[in-house]
Amino acid sequence: MDSPFPKETISADFCVVGGGIAGMTMALECARAGFRVVLMHDRPVPGGNASGECRVQISGADRLGKLPNLRETGILEELRLENCRINPNGSYSVWDMVLWSALETEPNLQVLYNCSCRAAVMAGNRIKTVTGWQTTTQKEITVAAKLFADCSGDAVLAPLTGADFRVGREARGEFGETIGPETADRRTMGMSCIFQTRRCDTPQPFEKPAWAHTYCDDSELPCGADGHANLHEGYWWVELGGECDSIADTEALRPELLKILLGVWDHIKNRGDHGAEHLALEWIQFLPSKRESRRYVGDHILTQRDIEAGGRFPDTVAYGGWTMDDHNPAGFRSAALGEPVNIHHPAPSPYGIPYRCLYSRNLDNLFVGGRCVSVTHAALSSTRVIGTCSTMAQAAGGAAAIALRRGISPREVGQRHLAELQQLLLRRDCYLPGVRLELPELAHARISGTGSTSEALRDGVTRVEGGALHQWRCRPGDQLTVEWDAPQHFRRISLIFESGMQRRIALVPGNPDCLRLPPELAKAYRLEARSEGRWRTLAEVSANARRRAVHPAEAPFDALRLTLLETYGAAETGLHALLAE
């Protein structure tokens, strides 16, 4: 019997399944390169675990701001700075709108919201189409594309396409890891539901629902009395699912997580002196945020040993730096077992992540991103955090653009065009440990400027690194001039500014740095070009909110001049790069 529901087919160059931060970043990078991209997402808002539906803070190599100058840049920095600009009250709905707007305003990108991927059609080892069910329209939507990517978290395309994948913890001996169990198993890190609170002027009573659990003593909780350090955004250790099937058992686990969550809040309010008399529940997470389920197998599987060695790969295209934060599969139950709920195994920051982890080893046109990339369980305990996922996804999005432009496979990008991909990412303000930006446009240019030395603009590093600033330091009124002996024909000029990389700008309750633009960021500046001895203005900016600002350049010129006019409060700032393309 034919379905009574309507069907629609869409053609695209690239189809990304899953619209969390990874899927968004990958889709945007490829779409901005001029290719037609469709993003299929099963929720009404983008952002995944980082959205207002789940509110997981975006962690990464800077370890919640504890390690300066390691914050992820590129598209993620663009999104976070825009949130700083328009969200002075720290609203998660406004953050959702920042993410929505980034997708909505990209002309080459079509987003299918509330559309859950449920089928795929193969032609040998290539995906031809994927099909999703859109709940709001009761429509079956099929997307035909040249390339596909799975950023769904649960790796939904793996069982639909026959792509190789893994589930669970590897045995220690398989890759020489020390974190895993002696014998491989299917246990994973679990999923969590959190809450957020609001401080009120008057005492706020709380009556526990009859169906919620009761916890009379701190010893019944995974972190004991120490687990209540932050009453405003707790708690990640309300976690289950690692001992079950973290996909199939989700709906059975969700009510249990809510019983635990409200039981913990009852304990805080009514069963001990936790300083919560004036706190009220503001928000409860009803959609659990997952850490681990399926993981694809690529041409390389990143391991604990790789991370500990610093990830020194010739095909480094992304980086991480979170500790190997391995969660006990028992989750909340670990307290009853007398076991730690998690262990932070040491990891260097930053460490490189190779391109070979970002595509399927047995399908010819499938990229992977987010927490389902090609890593072991031990390595995933570090790479799973959202900031790290964004760096891998932007790399895959750039690789997709190269593959489409050249008509090649994801694997061939790494085999034949790796340097092109690395330089593309560096020019998009991504950071690759050990890889320097090549600047042929400045090779024969003369650079001069007031303020500190401007020669740092030639060194190919676009952030503070190893104690070196790698920037032209300047104060309002200072000027930088770049001159060539002959007229140059460039299409655009990109400026990469200092953006307070020592700060933590992720949206987190109680974090003042996420409520305003960094004082170090250039607010106002003028960019001019010289032709036939006359200066003309390319851009006069009065309210910049970008670390990477791009300006078109049409007519030929033989000099550029940048004048810093104002910062967002700092006495001085810096310019890391001036790129002419």
PLM feature spans:
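Conserved N-terminal/central alpha/beta ligand/cofactor-binding core
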Residues: 3-7, 11, 29, 35-36, ...
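Predominantly extracellular/luminal regions of secreted and cell-surface proteins
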Residues: 439-462
